[in-house]
């Protein structure tokens, strides 16, 4: 199972569709179940769920598996039944893509366990989790370089990588209609499930412990990826702080959940 996490409007569907198009071929049978079907994809069978007539994610997934697909996309794992069916699909040799609503990538394991899925099943089937957000992109015509005051930046700012010494901020012009931003871009946090992470998930350890293990194996957080883009001049520090959360804030939310 490969999961994409993030709030509504964070680009999860676009990421999943891009992934399917990348692996699509005449020899690969791909079937999706979605709510709604947002784009028509050539060469891919897409099913629109309709709960009023009993066609839920779980029911449609059971039907899909009778057609012996190679790849299955489940629009969202919302409940225990859908989670169980997705797990069973992956255990029988199918590549499964789906989405969850969590604050970060490491929270996906505890989220599925909270739905009632056995920890050993989650640990053995989830291969990767990608969290994502969308940041506004600075207008290239009017963005302004400046030297930031260290007191204005949070403690997690990566000063050790800040060789240019400049960040950029919006000013507004005709091209961007005075907004200072033009378009959006993604920031990503990709967690690859290592043996250590599988063991932590199996033992029902906290999302914070899973995250520390992922960081040790080289994962870049959403905040870190956003800072990289800010240092490149693609977005502003204000936008980074508006959209992403510090590790401390995420840890506090996890402990209160």
Model-derived regions: residue spans:
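Short, flexible helix-loop junctions that flank or precede catalytic/ligand sites
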Residues: 1-257
């Amino acid at each position: 199972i490969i999961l994409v996490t993030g709030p509504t409007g964070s680009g999860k569907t676009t990421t999943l569709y891009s992934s399917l198009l990348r692996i699509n071929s005449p020899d690969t049978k791909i079937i999706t179940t979605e709510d709604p079907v947002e784009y028509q994809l050539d060469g891919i069978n897409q099913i629109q769920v309709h709960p009023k007539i009993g066609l839920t994610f779980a029911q449609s997934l059971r039907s899909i598996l009778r057609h012996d697909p190679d790849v299955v996309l489940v629009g969202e794992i919302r409940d225990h039944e859908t989670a169980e069916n997705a797990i069973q699909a992956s255990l029988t040799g199918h590549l499964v893509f789906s989405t969850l609503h969590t604050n970060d990538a490491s929270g996906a394991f505890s989220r599925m366990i909270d739905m009632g899925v056995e920890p050993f099943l989650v640990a053995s089937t989830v291969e990767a989790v990608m969290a994502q957000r969308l940041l506004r992109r600075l207008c290239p015509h009017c963005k302004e370089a400046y030297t930031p005051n260290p007191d204005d930046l949070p403690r997690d700012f990566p000063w050790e990588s800040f060789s240019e010494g400049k960040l950029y901020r919006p000013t507004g012009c005709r091209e961007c209609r005075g907004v200072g931003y033009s378009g959006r871009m993604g920031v990503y946090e990709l967690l690859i499930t290592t043996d250590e992470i599988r063991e932590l998930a199996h033992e029902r350890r906290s999302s914070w412990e899973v995250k520390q293990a992922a960081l040790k194996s080289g994962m870049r957080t959403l905040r870190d990826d956003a800072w990289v883009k800010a240092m490149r001049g693609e977005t502003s520090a204000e936008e980074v702080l508006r959209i992403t959360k510090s590790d401390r804030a995420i840890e506090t939310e996890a402990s209160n959940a």
